[in-house]
Amino acid sequence: ATFPHLAHLNVVLEVLYPALGIEVIPPPPITKKTIEIGVKLAPQNACFPMKVTLGNFIEGIEKGADTIFMAGGVGPCRFGYYGQIQRIIIEDLGYDVNFVLIDSPRYGWKNFFSSLKTMVGGKWSISRIHRAVRLAWNVLRYVEDLEKTSRLVRWKLKEPSQLDGLM
């Protein structure tokens, strides 16, 4: 399974998915090639993040991913529609992948757990999912704490760019 690079989401997903028994094939780091792929394939009026995440998916598929996980649903911007548009583009390109859109539990636990069931297939167990989600949540909190700390100390460094490789 692959997913897009969105902030530090990859760190969380690289913990969550193995805990759920899902093989992870992370896309390579975002490069000029990633951007070129997304710009070439996405609608011209699509925003830059949509193009980059599409490039992530194509590179993940080329590395062997047979499943794509993408957040979706409603939200404050067009982000909620990326997944639906990207699924159509990827299908039109002839890729045979399972595209799983994960809606926020904020808008309905039933859809959220339905997405999780699709992700884990026959390995469905409330306790397993609970442990995996709790682990991923803790990792997310630690990553956010690191991010906050890096912003607090960055200005004190002679070379603030020293933190760039860490965060």
Can you annotate each of these PLM segments?
Residues A1-M167:
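An N-terminal assembly and electron-transfer interface module characteristic of large anaerobic redox
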